[in-house]
C-alpha cells in the first residue's frame, strides 16, 4: 500500500516536471553514447585514486573538455587464465555526435589506460541514443 502511494506521488511529480520543462523537438538529436569500463587494479594491487584522477585530467579531459560522467562501480571479469577477479571500477560515459573522430578519441583513452596501468583489456560499449538538452 505504501509503495503504491509512493509510486503515484513520484509519477505525479515527474508529470508536473514534464509540464513545466517541456523539451522542444529541436532540443533532441541522435548521438552516440560510449561507456568505457576501467578496472582499478593491476598486477601489483589497487590503483590509487590519485593515479586515477591524474589519468582523467591528463588523458580524458583534454579529449572531451565539453564534458563526461564518471561512475563509481564494482566489476567482475575473467582473466586469460580463467580466474575470476573482482575489483573497484570506474565507468566514463561520453555522449557525442557519433563522428569517427570522437570514437577515435575514445579508443585513444582506452589504449592509454591499458598501456599506463598494464591492463589486459578496457571495455568500450557504444550505444546510439537520442540526447535532449
Locate predicted features.
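Bacterial signal peptide processing site
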Residues: 15-17
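C-terminal motif of bacterial Sec signal peptides marking the signal peptidase cleavage site
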Residues: 10-13
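Mature extracytoplasmic domains of secretory-pathway proteins
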Residues: 54-89, 94-101
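Helix-rich interaction surfaces within compact, conserved domain-sized segments
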Residues: 84-133
Amino acid at each position: 500500500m505504501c509503495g503504491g502511494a509512493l509510486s503515484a506521488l513520484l509519477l505525479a511529480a515527474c508529470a508536473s516536471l514534464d509540464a513545466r520543462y517541456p523539451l522542444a523537438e529541436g532540443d533532441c538529436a541522435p548521438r552516440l553514447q560510449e561507456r568505457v569500463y576501467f578496472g582499478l587494479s593491476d598486477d601489483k594491487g589497487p590503483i590509487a585514486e590519485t593515479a586515477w584522477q591524474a589519468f582523467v585530467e591528463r588523458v580524458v579531459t583534454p579529449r572531451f573538455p565539453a564534458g563526461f560522467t564518471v561512475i563509481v562501480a564494482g566489476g567482475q571479469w575473467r582473466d586469460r587464465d580463467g580466474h575470476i577477479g573482482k575489483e573497484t571500477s570506474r565507468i566514463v560515459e561520453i555522449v557525442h555526435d557519433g563522428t569517427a573522430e570522437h570514437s577515435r578519441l575514445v579508443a585513444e583513452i582506452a589504449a592509454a589506460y591499458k598501456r599506463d596501468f598494464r591492463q589486459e583489456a578496457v571495455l568500450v560499449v557504444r550505444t546510439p541514443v537520442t540526447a535532449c538538452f
